[in-house]
Amino acid sequence: MSDFDRRKFLKSAGAVAALGGLGVFGPGVNGSAFAQSGSATERNQIIKKTIPSTGEKIPAVGLGSWITFNVGNDIELRDQCADVMSAFFNAGGRMIDSSPMYGSAQDVIGYGLDKLGARDQVFSADKVWTSGDGAAQIAETSDRWNITQFDLLQVHNLLGINKNLPLLFDMKDQGLLRHVGVTTSHGRRTDDLIAVMKNERLDFVQVTYNPVDRKVEDYLLPLAYDRGIAVIINRPFRGGSLVERLAGQPLPEFAKDLQVKSWAQLILKYLIAHPAVTCPIPATTKPAHAMENMAAATGPLPDDKMREQIAAVIGVLV
C-alpha cells in the first residue's frame, strides 16, 4: 500500500469528522438514512458493505452459529434457532456462517431455512475443515444445508489449504461456488493468513477482531483493503464474554450520538465503521438479540476518534 493510500485508509473516518464536526458518520454507509426497527422500508435501508471482488452489497451484520446452533435433534431447540433466523432475516440480515466443526449447526441451519422458506434470503457461508477429502466434506455440507450453490466457502483455520484452496477456486471457476475465502480465529496463524492474502485471489478472509483484540488493525486489515478482500469478523463479543463483562456498566455519554441502546450495538458499530470490515457475525440463541445486533447496522457510525474512545472505554472496563 502506498503512503498516500495508507494515510487515506487510516484517516478516512477522521476526515468525515473534520468536515462535519460531529464525531460520527451520518447518515451512514451508502448515503442513506437509517432507522432502528424492522419494517420492510427500514430493512431496505440497512447499512450494507460492498464485496470488493464482485461489487455485491451485503448487510453489514451477519449471524454466526458456533455453539449456539449446535443443538442436535432436539426439535424445540431447533425451532428456537429457526426463530433466531427468522428475527435475523426480518431485521434485514443475510449472511449466516457455519462450519463442519460446529457439530449439528449445519443441519439446524438447513432445518431453519426449510421451515422459513428463506433460501432466497440467505447469503450462505460455510467452510471446508479437513486435511482429507475436501470435496466429500463439501458435498455433505451442501446436503446438511439442503443448498446447491454456496455464496461463500472458506478454508477453515487454513487446514489443508494446499489442497482445499485450489479445490474452492476450481469450484468457483466451474460456477459451483460464488466466493472463496480463508479463515482464522483468536489471532492464530495471522502471518500465515497474510501470506495467503498476498499470493492468492481471495474474495474473503475471516478473522477475530473487537475493541480488545486489535492485532489485525496493524497490517492485515490495511492489506485486505488494499487488495480488495472482504473481511468477516468472528468473535466480535469474544464468544459473549466481552458483553457479559460489560453488563451493568453504563454506556458512555457519547453513545447517544450513535443511537445505540447496548454495549453489543456499540461494539458492532465500532467494527462496521472500519473501512476494511465487511460483516461481523455475532452468534446468539435469542431472537431479540438477533434483532438488537441487526439494529447496529442502522443509524450513524463512529468516526476514527470515536472508535478510539470506544476501545479505550471498553479496555478500562474489562
Task: For the regions a language model picked out, list residue spans one by one.
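N-terminal binding-site loop/beta-alpha segment at the start of enzyme catalytic domains
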Residues: 2-120
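Hydrophobic packing residues within well-ordered alpha-helices of enzyme cores
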Residues: 109-112, 168, 193-196, 290-293
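Short loop/turn motifs at secondary-structure junctions
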Residues: 57, 89-95, 118, 146-149, ...
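Structured C-terminal cap/extension of enzyme domains
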Residues: 12-20, 24-25, 39, 51, ...
